[in-house]
């Protein structure tokens, strides 16, 4: 089975973000994994709050994924800060950066 990682925010209403990505993966018979960049309070009327994941916790999520079930593909959505973008680059750049992850 193919695997995919979504890096994005979590939408409590299920219409966007991690939740929507995982539904899409499942519909295409892809094993989905997620690394959450932020929790959002939102619905179809709008976003009322955002709580960003700490860079340390975000890195812990990516470490857990990339040391076990390495994804065949990565989909990136909402990334809430420059620090989280820089962490994403350590795991998703075309050049190997394993030594920089520590």
Functional labels for PLM-detected ranges:
Residues 1-73:
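Small-residue (G/A/S/T)-rich helix-start motifs and N-terminal tracts that mark the onset
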Residues 35, 77, 97:
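A cross-family glycoside hydrolase active-site/sugar-binding cleft signature
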Residues 72-85:
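N-terminal glycine-rich "phosphate-gripper" loop used for MgATP/nucleotide binding
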Residues 22-23, 85-90:
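Short amphipathic alpha-helices and their capping/turn segments at secondary-structure boundaries
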Residues 91-98:
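Conserved small/polar residues in nucleotide/adenosyl-binding loops
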């Amino acid at each position: 089975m193919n695997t995919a990682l979504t890096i994005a925010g979590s939408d409590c209403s299920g219409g966007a973000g991690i939740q929507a990505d995982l539904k899409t993966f499942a519909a295409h018979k892809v094993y989905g994994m997620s690394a959450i960049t932020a929790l959002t309070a939102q619905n179809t009327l709008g976003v009322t709050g955002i709580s960003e994941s700490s860079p340390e916790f975000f890195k812990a999520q990516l470490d857990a994924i990339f040391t076990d079930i390495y994804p065949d593909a990565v989909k990136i959505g909402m990334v809430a800060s420059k620090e989280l973008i820089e962490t994403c680059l350590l795991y998703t750049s075309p050049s190997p950066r394993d030594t920089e992850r520590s």
